[in-house]
A protein has these predicted regions:
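Short, conserved loop/helix-junction motifs that constitute active-site signature segments
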Residues: 13-18, 35-38
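Internal alpha-helical scaffold of NAD(P)-dependent oxidoreductase catalytic cores
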Residues: 32-41, 57-90, 100-142, 180, ...
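Active-site capping/gating segments
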Residues: 44-59
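Short hydrophobic/aromatic-enriched beta-strand-loop microsegments
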Residues: 20-23, 41-46
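Single conserved hydrophobic/aromatic residue that forms the stacking wall/gate
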Residues: 1-5, 9-10
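NAD(P)-dependent Rossmann-like dehydrogenase/reductase catalytic/cofactor-binding core
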Residues: 127-191
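ADP-ribose/adenylate-binding Rossmann-like module
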Residues: 15-29
Length: 191
């Protein structure tokens, strides 16, 4: 007999002591899971929202060989193994939260386009601008700096706008935002 709901009872009742487990819980370290499931193979996987369209990007970490698990996660998009568990935090902020950064920026584009077009037209055109930019980056395989330069003519409107972003510290603000996300991820793993 065991205490219903206790960790030991769950392990015994469902015979899960030597199974493979994949955790997608943010902030839950492998060591915590190993305490619950000492004889199991445990993997941490952090997919992003693109997984629902088979365009996900998943970081995988384990104390075991992760090559097979990396292959299994390719059914929802790209996947890769991180060398240490702390790298999951950076992945979570840049890849997991990344879509929210794009959506937020897209909203700002829409607000300005709303000065010219209807809300529906603005949403559609902004989505096309982002989509075509992404396709161009993937298709051409150029570095992003070269792609920026291909759009920004010397003395032109794009160059003026980019200079204003630099002047206002856009890159520094972005870096600080990423650092804030990583800090929060570390706080979550301590709770």
């Amino acid at each position: 007999s065991c205490l219903v709901g206790s960790e030991m009872c769950i392990r015994d009742r469902f015979n899960i002591s030597s199974k493979t487990f994949v955790s997608v819980a943010a902030g839950v370290k492998i060591s915590e899971l190993e305490n619950l499931l000492p004889s199991s193979k445990i993997f941490r996987a952090m997919p992003n929202v693109g997984a629902k369209d088979n365009l996900g990007i998943t970081a995988i970490y384990s104390n075991h060989d992760s090559k097979e698990m990396v292959e299994k996660f390719k059914f929802i998009g790209e996947s890769y193994e991180v060398e240490n568990e702390d790298q999951i935090d950076l992945h979570t902020v840049l890849i997991g939260s990344g879509p929210a950064f794009f959506y937020d920026l897209m909203q700002e584009f829409e607000k300005r386009l709303d000065e010219l077009l209807t809300d529906k037209e603005s949403k559609r055109l902004v989505s096309i601008v982002f989509l075509s930019s992404i396709i161009n980056a993937i298709k051409n395989g150029e570095n992003l700096e070269e792609l920026v330069e291909s759009v920004a003519s010397k003395g032109g409107t794009t160059e003026a706008a980019l200079q204003k972003l630099d002047e206002k510290g856009f890159k520094k603000i972005f870096s600080e935002a990423v650092d804030a996300g990583i800090k929060r991820a570390k706080e979550l793993s301590m709770n």
